[in-house]
């Protein structure tokens, strides 16, 4: 069972952080992961800059549950944690909820790096996080109503996914115009 668990990483919308350094929260106190390993991985997925800007950088001490960090910053730490574990299976459960658009772009970049050559299950309301998925399964009221690639689903006349996509991206365009 331990071997199976070591092959799966989970990134959820509710990230738990220990009252300890960013480094220890990323490595989960694994003595086999060095600061150089962490920095290299952070650079690979594009989040080194955010961590380096914190007072003390990787040794910045967070309070329990990360109360001094934004939701997006906690998500980025969780992504780096998952990336370092190099799982065979990655589960992202609403990993981009409660974040701003700048952090979402960072997370999308990190996601593209993390999911390479892995089985990935992405549970999302933000369709921007799943556009490049091989297969999208669309649920409505707990029932599967459509499945396929983004291109296939967007071309279904009166499709549920197509309606969601149009609503979501129309809203994003309106927000962009207001800002």
Where are these regions (language model features)?
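Conserved H-loop
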Residues: 48-55
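C-terminal boundary and immediately downstream tail of ABC-type ATPase nucleotide-binding domains
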Residues: 156-179
């Amino acid at each position: 069972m331990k071997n199976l668990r070591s092959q799966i990483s989970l990134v959820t919308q509710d990230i738990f952080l220990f009252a300890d350094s960013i480094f220890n929260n990323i490595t989960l106190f694994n003595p086999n992961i060095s600061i150089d390993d962490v920095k290299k991985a952070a650079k690979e997925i594009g989040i080194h800059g955010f961590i380096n800007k914190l007072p003390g950088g990787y040794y910045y001490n967070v309070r329990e549950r990360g109360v001094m960090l934004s939701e997006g910053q906690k998500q980025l730490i969780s992504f780096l944690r998952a990336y370092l574990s190099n799982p065979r299976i990655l589960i992202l459960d609403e990993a981009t909820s409660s974040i701003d658009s700048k952090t979402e772009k960072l997370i999308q970049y990190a996601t593209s790096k993390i999911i390479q050559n892995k089985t990935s299950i992405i549970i999302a309301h933000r369709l921007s996080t799943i556009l490049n998925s091989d297969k999208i399964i669309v649920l409505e009221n707990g029932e599967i109503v459509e499945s396929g690639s983004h291109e296939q689903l967007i071309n279904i006349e009166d499709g549920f996914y197509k309606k969601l996509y149009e609503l979501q991206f129309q809203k994003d365009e309106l927000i962009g115009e207001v800002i």
